Amino acid sequence: MIKLLHVNDYKVNTADFSPLLNDPIVERFEKQICEFVGAKYACSLHSATMAIFFTLLEQEKQTIDIPSIIPPVVPNAIITAGHKVNFIDNVDWVGNSYVLKKFDDYKIIDSAQQLDENQFKQQAKDEDLMIFS
């Protein structure tokens, strides 16, 4: 066997990360975000891209319409989650939220460029998911 990078094989015990994932600071941050945007729940992830990916991962695979002027990480997350991407010519969303996908019971709102007080109460229903970055 050829080892190109000469890197040792390590096993990572993910239990070691528990204090980083369930930290009181993260919980306080999530609570403050809820209070600020008017949402009932919040879940912190390391990026909005990962939130999009996780949100779409278990959904029925379909084509998702997204603005054509968007960072490439967004279509990448959609495709990696198993969906197809359809780019639309919509520049009105720039700097604002837009509906990433509307399902029967709820919608996913990509709000990576906007974070306003009471925004969730104004733009979403309790069952909706709004992604901030």
Predicted regions and their residues:
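Structured loop/turn residues at beta-strand edges in well-structured enzyme cores
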Residues: V37, K102, K125
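Conserved PLP-binding active-site segment in aminotransferase class I/II-type PLP enzymes
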Residues: M1-E60, A81
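Short acidic donor-binding loop at the edge of a beta-strand
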Residues: Y41, T63, D128-L129
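Conserved residues at the C-terminal ends of beta-strands
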Residues: L45, P67, S133
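PLP-dependent aminotransferase-like
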Residues: L57-S111, L115
